[in-house]
Amino acid sequence: PASPQKRAASPRRSPKKSPRKSPKKSPRKRSASP
């Protein structure tokens, strides 16, 4: 069970599949732009 648990953490940490964690797509920078 320790093997599949490490795999699930691999794609979760990946900022490529997680655009919400990506600071590039963050709407915070768009809000500063008038």
Swiss-Prot record:
Single annotated GO MF: DNA binding
Annotated GO CC locations: chromosome; nucleus
Region of interest (Disordered), residue spans: 1-34
Compartmental location: Nucleus; Chromosome
Tissue specificity note: Sperm.
Keyword annotations of the record: Chromosome, DNA-binding, Nucleus
Biased composition (Basic residues): 9-34
Role of this protein: Histones H1 are necessary for the condensation of nucleosome chains into higher-order structures.
Name of the protein this chain belongs to: Histone H1, sperm
Source organism of the structure: Strongylocentrotus purpuratus
